[in-house]
């Protein structure tokens, strides 16, 4: 039996998450764990990086993991590693400074091959007994300014689980991937994709709920695809993802090709880049279930093998916050519902 969290989970947008985390790291006593796709010393994240280094220097167990995508995006080839770049130089400096202070820095994945294969897309942070996860915020300037959020949970058991997950991911060999798993916690079911190609606890759970739901609220960076995309589109009051012109070349190509293949269209009309990922399912009896986290609900990510994390919850307090986020930061300026066709 799990104890309830010390406080109700709270949804924090990127800038608020960064401020909260930086303050927590500055007063950390025992441990800090951070996993994200990208971690970089940028203008907005510089204070956090300094706090991580200072915490390690005063004896806190600080461990940071990020995907090599941090510095290879746009600079890697299919056969060779990343070419020299400002981000590569910055990553090397971060590695050196954190290790020099007594912390650990682990770069995940390979620099060569397909850019979307085998990525670590998981986002989680732990400071002592507080956890931030189940959202999509990366630790660089674009990450904290996107339309996105993280959930803050004061729960020692959850913090222990996420700390262990961070360490397990960091300990894996480059080609090693753990199986998908589901952990029961007071906040709900924690769905973990270990990155094995074709295996996703998150996609499977979302598909199962979508098939049972009467209606679905959708928000994601990308156009939903595969059987989940079809089930969501049938039940959603429109789909909410970026238009291709809002994205960088690789992401724009993925969005455009997904739209062409599925016929789905987006109602999102705001200019800021949408990076949040959530589904809220309303059952025929009125019960609501949400899945929120790092997964974009795209079948290709499952096929390629991507590490992800999400929360499945029935907590009305959490779901209300997700729906309010959607109303205030996603729905504003929307076009009329239209999910299929030209």
Can you say where each PLM-predicted feature lies in the sequence?
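Charged, low-complexity intrinsically disordered terminal segments
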Residues: 1-342
């Amino acid at each position: 039996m799990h104890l309830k969290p010390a406080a109700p989970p709270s949804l924090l947008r990127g800038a608020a998450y960064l401020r909260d985390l930086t303050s927590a790291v500055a007063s950390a006593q025992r441990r800090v764990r951070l996993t994200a796709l990208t971690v970089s010393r940028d203008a907005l994240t510089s204070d956090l990086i300094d706090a991580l280094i200072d915490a390690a220097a005063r004896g806190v167990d600080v461990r940071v993991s990020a995907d090599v995508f941090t510095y290879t995006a746009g600079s890697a080839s299919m056969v060779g590693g990343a070419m020299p770049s400002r981000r590569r130089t910055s990553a090397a400096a971060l590695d050196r400074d954190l290790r020099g202070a007594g912390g650990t820095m682990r770069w995940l994945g390979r620099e060569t091959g397909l850019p979307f294969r085998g990525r670590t897309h998981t986002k989680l942070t732990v400071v002592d007994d507080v956890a931030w996860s189940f959202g999509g915020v990366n630790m660089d300037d674009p990450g904290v300014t996107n339309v996105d959020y993280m959930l803050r949970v004061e729960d020692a058991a959850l913090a222990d689980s996420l700390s262990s997950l961070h360490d397990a991911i960091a300990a894996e060999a480059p080609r090693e991937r753990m199986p998908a798993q589901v952990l029961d916690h007071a906040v709900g079911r924690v769905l973990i994709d270990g990155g094995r190609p074709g295996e996703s606890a998150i996609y499977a759970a979302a598909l199962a709920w979508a098939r049972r739901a009467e209606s679905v609220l959708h928000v994601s960076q990308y156009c939903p695809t595969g059987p989940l995309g079809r089930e969501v589109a049938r039940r959603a009051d429109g789909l909410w993802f970026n238009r291709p012109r809002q994205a960088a070349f690789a992401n724009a190509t993925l969005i455009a090709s997904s739209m062409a293949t599925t016929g789905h269209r987006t109602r999102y009309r705001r200019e800021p880049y949408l990076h949040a990922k959530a589904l809220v399912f309303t059952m025929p009896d009125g019960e609501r279930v949400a899945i929120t986290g790092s997964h974009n609900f795209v079948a290709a990510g499952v096929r390629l093998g991507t590490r992800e994390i999400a929360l499945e919850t029935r907590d009305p307090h959490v779901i209300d916050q997700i729906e309010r986020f959607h109303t205030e930061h996603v729905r504003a300026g929307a076009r009329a519902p239209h999910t299929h066709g030209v």
